[in-house]
Amino acid sequence: MIELYHSEGCPFCVKVRVAFEQMGVAYISKAMPLRVTSCFKDELIKLGGKSQVPFLVDPERGLQMYESDDIIDYVKKNYIKS
């Protein structure tokens, strides 16, 4: 299952979460404070090299990505049946 690292107050994260909800996409939520100071910070840096959110991890395909529009496009192409 895909994992989404996000912050509640981040507008780009909200955009991704709303899109996932509208598309009916199931995901593991890795919520953190807006200022990434939580235990997820080290995990984010280890996975992707920076502590930016939103950050998507797709363990089935070995993919990690940043950027809300890229995340939404990727999920549409790979998880939504036309």
Give the label of every model feature segment:
Residues 2-8, 14-82:
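GST-like domain detector, emphasizing the conserved glutathione-binding G-site
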